[in-house]
Amino acid sequence: MKEQLIPIQWKDDALVLLDQTLLPNEVVYESFNTAEGVWDAIQVMKVRGAPAIGVSAAYGVYLGVKEFVESTEAEFIDEVKRVCAYLATSRPTAVNLFWALERMESVATDHTHLSIAQLKDRLLEEAKEIHREDEEINRQIGEHALTLFHDGMGVLTHCNAGALATTKYGTATAPMYLAKEKGWDLKIYSDETRPRLQGSTLTALELQRAGIDVTVITDNMAAMVMSQGKVDAVIVGCDRVAANGDVANKIGTLGVSILAKYYNIPFYVAAPTPTIDLKTPTGKEIPIEERDASEVINRFGQYSAPKESKVYNPAFDVTPHENVTAIITEKGIVKAPFTENLKKLF
C-alpha cells in the first residue's frame, strides 16, 4: 500500500492542493495564497469533486480577505460578500460550493460586533471546521453504505467520488476503504469516465494505492460487465440532489443508472447532506455546466476528430429518482419516496 494522496491541506497560511490534472503521471502539490488562485484551481479542475470544491472555496474566502486593510467592519463584511460572490462563479453545478460560501458569508454577517482581526480568525476557523466535518461525513457515509455490501461482491462506480474528490475516504469509495479495513475483498469496476477520464486517472489510481482490487473499463463496457453478472451493485457520488431525489452527477451516470435498472442491479448514490438541495424541486432546475470542446476532441494534444467538429460537452447529467435505489448520507440511508424522506434529514 502506497502513501495516500491528500487532495487538500492547509499549511503555512496557504491552501495546498494536489494538482489532479497531472494525475496519474505526476504527483504535484501547489500552494495558493489568493482567492483568484483558488478560483482558477476550481475552474480548471486542479481540485474537483463537490466536497473538495466546497472546502477549497471556504479557504479561498479567507485568502481573499486576509490582507484587507480598510478601516471599518462594514467595509470588511462587504468585501467578504464580494469574494464569496466571485468564488461562486467558478463552477455552477456543485451545490457544496454555494453551501460552503454561504457558511463563510454568515460568519461575517452574524458577527458584526467583532473586529476585523477577529472576523478574519473566525473565517479561517470556519474553513477548517468545514474541512474537518467533511472527513467525518465521509466515514459515516461509508459505514452506512457498508451495510448494503458484503464480502466478495462486485461493485461498479463512475467518475471519482473518492478521497481525491473529498478530504478523506471519499463518498462512493468510502465503503470500499472501510471494507478493506475489515478484510473484505470487493471487486471494483471503474468506468474510465469520458471525456476527462476521472475514473481511470483518479479512482483507479487511489484504489490501487490503497491495495483495493480495481479494474478499469471503458464507459461502453459497463453493459457487458453487468450482463456477465460481475456487478452486484453500483455506487456513485453526486454534485447535487434535488428535493425529489433526482441526482446530478458526472456525465455518463444517467446511462449507468439505466443499465443498472435493466439488469436489476441496485443503484446507490453517496450524498453528503450538503449536496442535497431542497430548494431545487427537480433535476430539471439544476444548472448543467458545459465545458470546452477540446476536452472531447483534443484531450491529449492531438485531435481525435476533425478540428472544426461541432462538440456538445455537458459536464454532468441528471439521473431521475426512479432509477435510484437509495441515497446514502452521513445521517442514514434514504429510500423512496424521496420528496418526503429527504426532508426528514434536516
Swiss-Prot record:
What is its pathway?
Answer: Carbohydrate degradation
Transmembrane parts of this sequence: none
> Which residues are tagged with the site Transition state stabilizer?
159
Q: Which HAMAP family match?
A: Deoxyribose1P_isomerase (MF_02229), Salvage_MtnA (MF_01678)
Q: Which InterPro entries match?
A: Deoxyribose1P_isomerase_DrdI, IF-2B-related, IF-M1Pi, IF_2B-like_C, Initiation_fac_2B_a/b/d, M1Pi_N, NagB/RpiA_transferase-like
Residues annotated as binding substrate: 48-50, 91, 198, 249-250
- Which family is this protein grouped under? Belongs to the EIF-2B alpha/beta/delta subunits family. DrdI subfamily.
Q: What is this protein called?
A: 5-deoxyribose 1-phosphate isomerase
Write down the Pfam families for this protein, in alphabetical order.
IF-2B
Superkingdom in the source lineage: Bacteria
**Any one GO BP annotation for this protein:** pentose catabolic process
Q: What class of enzyme is it?
A: isomerase
- Function of this protein? Catalyzes the isomerization of 5-deoxy-alpha-D-ribose 1-phosphate to 5-deoxy-D-ribulose 1-phosphate, as part of a 5-deoxyribose salvage pathway that recycles this toxic radical SAM enzyme by-product to mainstream metabolites.
GO molecular function annotation: S-methyl-5-thioribose-1-phosphate isomerase activity
**Residues annotated as the enzyme's active site:** 239 (proton donor)
Catalyses which reaction(s)? 5-deoxy-alpha-D-ribose 1-phosphate = 5-deoxy-D-ribulose 1-phosphate
Mind telling me which SUPFAM superfamilies this protein's record contains?
Answer: NagB/RpiA/CoA transferase-like
The UniProt record lists the EC number as 5.3.1.-
Is Isomerase tagged as a keyword?
A: yes
Q: Which keywords does this Swiss-Prot/TrEMBL entry list?
A: Carbohydrate metabolism, Isomerase
